[in-house]
Structure formats: structure tokens, C-alpha cells
Design a protein with these regions (language model features):
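Class I S-adenosyl-L-methionine-dependent methyltransferase catalytic core
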Residues: 1-184
Length: 184
């Protein structure tokens, strides 16, 4: 895995290896990550990355948030409660020397502490476990999400926009669906 574009283009991320079977780590492939950022930065949604705060829920390796930093995001908060994920995220932040621009929270994504509003949220829960919607609701209830926030939700199937959100786009990449939402 590597950073696709921006100031850290080509930087190799810490290898996941065999990891921990119980950690449910399923890193977003380089191809899907590149396609997601092409859609986000393609002009239809303005520029939801440059200069914004980003929330990376179920961060895993941190690749999505770090890609956003490489492309100009101001700050990323990574959320994951897994031991393996915490090690991968902190290792990748150290590799890119971006600790000053990152916060790593070890908590469940549906039990977030109060936070600063973010302009972009990556939501990448383990597939098929129905964890995405509770995490999205928690992020909104605790101040991480405000009107106009763009959410990129990665799941096994396209997601229906929950109350308080509108669907912007949905795309399939193999067995992965990315649903883009915006808070209303």
C-alpha cells in the first residue's frame, strides 16, 4: 500500500502482514482509494479535501486519512479501537512525519467523544456488521459532522442516505461500494 498523490506521493505505508484475524482489517485498495479521490476532487463537490478537517472512522491502517493529508487536508482524526489498527495508524503517521496534523483516538466509532466539526468523513466499517449507521449518528451527535459535511461510506453494498443526509453518488469497485453523502 502506498500514498497515491500529493505531497507524499509514492510513500509506502506500513505493511498489514497477517495482522490479526479478529481485527477485521480490510485496507481500501490503492485502486479504490485513487478512484474515490478522483470522484471527490473531480469538481462535482467543490474541493472537500484541501484545508479541511477529516474524520477517519474505522481507520484501520489510516490510508484514507493519510491520502487526504497528502492532498492538502489540514488535520485528520483517526478512530479505531483495535490494537493492530492503532499500531498501523501510528506507524504510518510516523513514516510520513505528520504527527502534528493527526489525532488518533482509541474508541469505538459509535462512542465518540465531542469533537471539532470536519468537512470530510471516511466511514469504512467492517462489511456486513451494521456498524456504519450507528457510527454516523454518533459523529453527528457529538459535533464531528455539521451541515455540508461530505461522507464517503465504504461497504459491501450501496447505502441509503439516512435521515439528515442526502445521497450524492454511489459507485461500485468489485465487491466494494462507495456511497457519498452530504449532511443537510
Amino acid at each position: 500500500m502506498r500514498i497515491i498523490a500529493g505531497t507524499h506521493r509514492g510513500a509506502q505505508l506500513v505493511p498489514v502482514g497477517d495482522g490479526d484475524a479478529g481485527a477485521h482489517l480490510r485496507p481500501t485498495s490503492d485502486r479504490v482509494r485513487e478512484s474515490l479521490f478522483n470522484v471527490l476532487l473531480g469538481g462535482r463537490f467543490g474541493d472537500p479535501v484541501r484545508g479541511v478537517r477529516v474524520l477517519d472512522l474505522f481507520a484501520g491502517t489510516g490510508a484514507l486519512g493519510l491520502e487526504a493529508l497528502s492532498r492538502g487536508a489540514a488535520h485528520v482524526t483517526f478512530v479505531d479501537d483495535g490494537t493492530v489498527a492503532q499500531r498501523l495508524i501510528t506507524g504510518n503517521i510516523a513514516r510520513l512525519k505528520r504527527a502534528a496534523d493527526c489525532t488518533v483516538l482509541r474508541c469505538k466509532a459509535d462512542a465518540l467523544p465531542a469533537g471539532q466539526t470536519c468537512g470530510l468523513v471516511f466511514l469504512d466499517p467492517p462489511y456486513g456488521m451494521n456498524l456504519g449507521l450507528p457510527a454516523l449518528r454518533a459523529a453527528r451527535a457529538t459535533g464531528w459532522i455539521a451541515p455540508g459535511t461530505v461522507v464517503a461510506w465504504e461497504e459491501r453494498s450501496a447505502q441509503i442516505a439516512p435521515q439528515g443526509f442526502r445521497a450524492l453518488d454511489a459507485r461500485r469497485y468489485g465487491d466494494t461500494w462507495i456511497t457519498l453523502l452530504e449532511t443537510t
